[in-house]
Amino acid sequence: MTRDWLRRGLRFLLFAMLGFVGLSVLLVLVFRVVPVFGSMVMLERKVESWVSGEPVSIQQQWRPWNALSDNAKLAVIASEDQRFPMHHGFDFNQMQKALDAWFSGDSLRGASTISQQTAKNLFLWTDRSWVRKGLEAWFTVLIELLWPKERILEVYLNIVEWDRGVFGLEAAAQHYFGVSADRLSAAQASRLAAILPNPREWSASRPSSYIVKRSQWIQRQMRQLGGSAYLERL
């Protein structure tokens, strides 16, 4: 009897794992070609607002690659992940630097790539549990295998959070500057990129001195990367 239960348990576990793998691969393949009008983080924010009793309206409008400002594409890469065209989802150089700084006494800083952030924002939730990190790694591998780099950045720019209830570049451009996503200047794009580490607390339209300095640094990095020509490497 015990062996039968063990055999059934192992069989169930095997089928559950195969089902998860199949479903996750299918989801990633679907989102390779289908516009993304929602994400797990958006759903999480709606649930949070319902629990807190503070309603929030989600603003998000999908824009295809050619309707997204090159300035914004480059600013986000310059700010978040300068090795984005080269790595395969994980930047081990940045991970090592973050660990070295931590061992030296600094606070542990993030080293997530744009690919990792896309996986987390689209498919997962925002806590820092090991379960979530493991699933993030799995989905990162899948999107790196099944999507071109251009698609990863396109989805990221359309779903990333830029303020309370504001998701995606089009909504952020309208919210902060009153322009469409394809009309963002280098200065505006750099400010949007500068607030990404803490978008619900920082503002691109009313920047602190820190955000001003960070956006200036991002613009310098954009020039050093080679401007829009850098995007041809994607």
UniProtKB/Swiss-Prot annotation:
Gene3D superfamilies according to UniProt: Biosynthetic peptidoglycan transglycosylase-like (1.10.3810.10)
Reactions that this protein is recorded to catalyse: [GlcNAc-(1->4)-Mur2Ac(oyl-L-Ala-gamma-D-Glu-L-Lys-D-Ala-D-Ala)](n)-di-trans,octa-cis-undecaprenyl diphosphate + beta-D-GlcNAc-(1->4)-Mur2Ac(oyl-L-Ala-gamma-D-Glu-L-Lys-D-Ala-D-Ala)-di-trans,octa-cis-undecaprenyl diphosphate = [GlcNAc-(1->4)-Mur2Ac(oyl-L-Ala-gamma-D-Glu-L-Lys-D-Ala-D-Ala)](n+1)-di-trans,octa-cis-undecaprenyl diphosphate + di-trans,octa-cis-undecaprenyl diphosphate + H(+)
Top-level taxon of the source organism: Bacteria
Enzyme class name: transferase
Membrane topology of the entry: Single-pass membrane protein
GO CC terms in record: peptidoglycan-based cell wall; plasma membrane
Molecular function per GO: pentosyltransferase activity; peptidoglycan glycosyltransferase activity
Protein purpose: Peptidoglycan polymerase that catalyzes glycan chain elongation from lipid-linked precursors.
PANTHER family: BIOSYNTHETIC PEPTIDOGLYCAN TRANSGLYCOSYLASE, MONOFUNCTIONAL BIOSYNTHETIC PEPTIDOGLYCAN TRANSGLYCOSYLASE
Name of the featured protein: Biosynthetic peptidoglycan transglycosylase
Annotated source species: Chromohalobacter salexigens (strain ATCC BAA-138 / DSM 3043 / CIP 106854 / NCIMB 13768 / 1H11)
